[in-house]
Amino acid sequence: MSEEVMAIFKAAGAILEGHFLLTSGLHSPVYWEKFRVLQHPHYTERLCGFIADHYRRSEVQVVAGPTTGGIIIAFEVARQLGVRSIFAEKEGGKRVFRRGFTLESGERVLVVDDVLTTGSSISEVMEAVARLGGIVIGVAVLVNRAEQDKQFGVPLFNCLRTVTPTYTPSDCPLCAAGIPLTRPGSEAER
Protein backbone atom coordinates (compact mmCIF):
# COMPACT_ATOMS: atom_id res chain seq x y z
CA MET A 1 0.00 0.00 0.00
CA SER A 2 2.76 2.49 0.91
CA GLU A 3 4.28 2.25 -2.57
CA GLU A 4 0.90 2.94 -4.18
CA VAL A 5 0.26 5.90 -1.87
CA MET A 6 3.69 7.36 -2.62
CA ALA A 7 3.07 6.86 -6.36
CA ILE A 8 -0.24 8.76 -6.08
CA PHE A 9 1.38 11.71 -4.30
CA LYS A 10 4.23 11.78 -6.85
CA ALA A 11 1.89 11.53 -9.83
CA ALA A 12 -0.11 14.47 -8.47
CA GLY A 13 3.06 16.54 -7.93
CA ALA A 14 2.19 16.77 -4.25
CA ILE A 15 5.64 16.32 -2.68
CA LEU A 16 7.32 19.72 -2.72
CA GLU A 17 10.90 20.51 -1.72
CA GLY A 18 12.18 23.85 -0.41
CA HIS A 19 11.73 25.71 2.88
CA PHE A 20 8.17 25.64 4.17
CA LEU A 21 6.25 27.07 7.11
CA LEU A 22 3.85 24.35 8.26
CA THR A 23 0.47 25.00 9.87
CA SER A 24 2.03 23.86 13.16
CA GLY A 25 4.50 26.78 13.00
CA LEU A 26 7.40 24.40 12.35
CA HIS A 27 9.67 24.65 9.30
CA SER A 28 10.41 21.76 6.93
CA PRO A 29 12.36 21.07 3.73
CA VAL A 30 9.44 18.97 2.41
CA TYR A 31 5.78 19.90 2.08
CA TRP A 32 3.01 17.41 1.32
CA GLU A 33 0.52 19.45 -0.70
CA LYS A 34 -2.45 17.17 -0.20
CA PHE A 35 -4.78 19.36 -2.24
CA ARG A 36 -2.86 18.41 -5.37
CA VAL A 37 -4.04 14.87 -4.61
CA LEU A 38 -7.50 15.71 -3.26
CA GLN A 39 -8.41 17.61 -6.44
CA HIS A 40 -8.51 14.23 -8.21
CA PRO A 41 -11.59 12.23 -7.15
CA HIS A 42 -10.08 8.92 -8.26
CA TYR A 43 -6.98 9.45 -6.07
CA THR A 44 -9.11 10.59 -3.14
CA GLU A 45 -11.42 7.61 -3.51
CA ARG A 46 -8.48 5.19 -3.58
CA LEU A 47 -6.68 6.68 -0.56
CA CYS A 48 -9.85 6.94 1.51
CA GLY A 49 -10.62 3.37 0.51
CA PHE A 50 -7.53 2.21 2.41
CA ILE A 51 -8.87 3.93 5.53
CA ALA A 52 -12.44 2.65 5.05
CA ASP A 53 -11.21 -0.90 4.50
CA HIS A 54 -9.07 -0.74 7.63
CA TYR A 55 -11.99 0.38 9.84
CA ARG A 56 -14.83 -1.43 8.02
CA ARG A 57 -15.43 -3.92 10.88
CA SER A 58 -15.07 -1.31 13.66
CA GLU A 59 -18.74 -0.28 13.75
CA VAL A 60 -17.95 3.35 12.87
CA GLN A 61 -21.08 5.49 13.04
CA VAL A 62 -19.62 8.90 12.16
CA VAL A 63 -16.40 10.08 10.49
CA ALA A 64 -15.09 13.46 11.69
CA GLY A 65 -12.25 15.62 10.46
CA PRO A 66 -10.85 19.10 10.94
CA THR A 67 -11.23 21.88 8.39
CA THR A 68 -10.07 22.02 5.59
CA GLY A 69 -8.50 18.89 4.06
CA GLY A 70 -10.11 16.72 6.71
CA ILE A 71 -13.56 17.64 5.38
CA ILE A 72 -12.91 15.96 2.04
CA ILE A 73 -11.35 12.89 3.64
CA ALA A 74 -14.12 12.56 6.24
CA PHE A 75 -16.77 12.78 3.54
CA GLU A 76 -15.19 10.16 1.27
CA VAL A 77 -14.38 7.70 4.07
CA ALA A 78 -17.93 8.11 5.42
CA ARG A 79 -19.37 7.61 1.94
CA GLN A 80 -17.45 4.36 1.56
CA LEU A 81 -18.52 3.18 5.03
CA GLY A 82 -22.14 4.26 4.52
CA VAL A 83 -22.17 6.59 7.57
CA ARG A 84 -22.36 10.33 8.30
CA SER A 85 -19.46 12.75 8.07
CA ILE A 86 -18.97 15.92 10.09
CA PHE A 87 -16.16 18.42 10.52
CA ALA A 88 -14.82 20.60 13.30
CA GLU A 89 -13.91 24.23 12.75
CA LYS A 90 -11.67 26.59 14.71
CA GLU A 91 -13.58 28.86 17.05
CA GLY A 92 -12.21 30.69 20.07
CA GLY A 93 -8.92 28.80 20.06
CA LYS A 94 -10.43 25.32 19.89
CA ARG A 95 -12.26 23.14 17.38
CA VAL A 96 -16.01 22.85 17.57
CA PHE A 97 -18.79 21.25 15.59
CA ARG A 98 -21.08 23.94 14.17
CA ARG A 99 -23.60 24.04 11.32
CA GLY A 100 -25.99 21.79 13.22
CA PHE A 101 -23.56 18.87 13.56
CA THR A 102 -24.36 16.74 16.60
CA LEU A 103 -23.34 13.43 18.10
CA GLU A 104 -25.43 11.07 20.16
CA SER A 105 -23.97 10.03 23.50
CA GLY A 106 -21.78 7.00 22.88
CA GLU A 107 -21.75 7.37 19.10
CA ARG A 108 -18.65 5.69 17.63
CA VAL A 109 -16.46 8.20 15.75
CA LEU A 110 -13.49 7.74 13.46
CA VAL A 111 -11.32 10.88 13.33
CA VAL A 112 -9.49 11.46 10.04
CA ASP A 113 -7.06 14.05 8.71
CA ASP A 114 -4.83 14.58 5.72
CA VAL A 115 -1.26 14.96 7.02
CA LEU A 116 -0.11 14.26 10.58
CA THR A 117 2.82 16.35 11.82
CA THR A 118 2.23 17.38 15.45
CA GLY A 119 -1.22 15.83 15.93
CA SER A 120 -2.76 19.01 17.29
CA SER A 121 -5.66 19.11 14.79
CA ILE A 122 -6.51 15.48 15.50
CA SER A 123 -6.36 16.04 19.27
CA GLU A 124 -8.62 19.09 18.93
CA VAL A 125 -11.20 17.10 16.94
CA MET A 126 -11.03 14.29 19.51
CA GLU A 127 -11.73 16.85 22.27
CA ALA A 128 -14.69 18.23 20.30
CA VAL A 129 -16.07 14.69 19.90
CA ALA A 130 -15.71 14.06 23.65
CA ARG A 131 -17.50 17.33 24.49
CA LEU A 132 -20.53 16.09 22.54
CA GLY A 133 -20.44 12.65 24.19
CA GLY A 134 -19.07 10.71 21.22
CA ILE A 135 -16.46 7.96 21.55
CA VAL A 136 -13.40 8.10 19.31
CA ILE A 137 -12.64 4.53 18.23
CA GLY A 138 -9.72 5.29 15.91
CA VAL A 139 -7.67 7.86 14.02
CA ALA A 140 -6.58 7.70 10.37
CA VAL A 141 -4.45 9.94 8.16
CA LEU A 142 -3.29 9.88 4.58
CA VAL A 143 0.32 10.72 5.47
CA ASN A 144 1.98 10.42 8.88
CA ARG A 145 5.06 12.62 8.64
CA ALA A 146 5.62 12.97 12.40
CA GLU A 147 9.20 12.53 13.53
CA GLN A 148 8.06 10.63 16.63
CA ASP A 149 5.16 8.21 17.03
CA LYS A 150 2.02 10.00 18.20
CA GLN A 151 -0.21 8.41 20.81
CA PHE A 152 -3.90 9.27 20.77
CA GLY A 153 -5.14 6.51 23.08
CA VAL A 154 -6.87 4.79 20.15
CA PRO A 155 -5.53 2.91 17.12
CA LEU A 156 -3.81 5.08 14.49
CA PHE A 157 -3.85 4.05 10.83
CA ASN A 158 -1.85 5.83 8.18
CA CYS A 159 -1.85 5.18 4.45
CA LEU A 160 1.80 6.26 4.33
CA ARG A 161 4.39 6.63 7.10
CA THR A 162 7.33 8.83 6.20
CA VAL A 163 9.61 10.78 8.51
CA THR A 164 10.11 14.32 7.29
CA PRO A 165 12.35 16.59 9.34
CA THR A 166 10.82 19.63 11.00
CA TYR A 167 12.50 22.46 12.86
CA THR A 168 11.48 25.17 15.24
CA PRO A 169 12.11 28.55 13.60
CA SER A 170 14.96 29.29 16.02
CA ASP A 171 16.74 26.00 15.17
CA CYS A 172 16.01 25.86 11.44
CA PRO A 173 19.11 25.21 9.31
CA LEU A 174 17.19 26.41 6.25
CA CYS A 175 16.69 29.81 7.88
CA ALA A 176 20.36 29.86 8.88
CA ALA A 177 21.30 29.16 5.24
CA GLY A 178 19.16 32.10 4.10
CA ILE A 179 16.74 29.96 2.06
CA PRO A 180 13.49 31.92 1.58
CA LEU A 181 10.54 30.64 3.60
CA THR A 182 7.40 29.63 1.68
CA ARG A 183 3.98 29.69 3.32
CA PRO A 184 1.94 27.11 1.38
CA GLY A 185 -1.70 28.02 0.97
CA SER A 186 -1.11 31.57 2.19
CA GLU A 187 -2.45 34.70 0.57
CA ALA A 188 1.06 35.40 -0.71
CA GLU A 189 0.87 32.38 -3.04
CA ARG A 190 -2.55 33.10 -4.54
Predicted regions and their residues:
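Active-site-facing substrate-recognition patch
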Residues: M1-R57, E187-R190
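A contiguous pocket-lining binding segment that forms or flanks enzyme active sites
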Residues: L103-A140
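Short, glycine/charge-rich flexible loops or terminal/linker lids adjacent to PRPP-binding catalytic cores
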Residues: I73-L110, T118-S120, L174
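Hydrophobic/aromatic beta-strand patches that form the interior of the parallel beta-sheet core
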Residues: A64, I86, L110, I137-A140, ...
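PRPP-dependent phosphoribosyltransferase catalytic core
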Residues: S2-I8, M126-R190
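A generic structural signal for well-ordered alpha-helical segments
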Residues: Y55, V77-A78, V129, D149
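Short glycine-rich phosphate-binding loop at a beta-alpha junction
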Residues: S58-T67
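Residue-level preference for short coil/turn positions at secondary-structure junctions
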Residues: E59, E104-G106, F152, T168
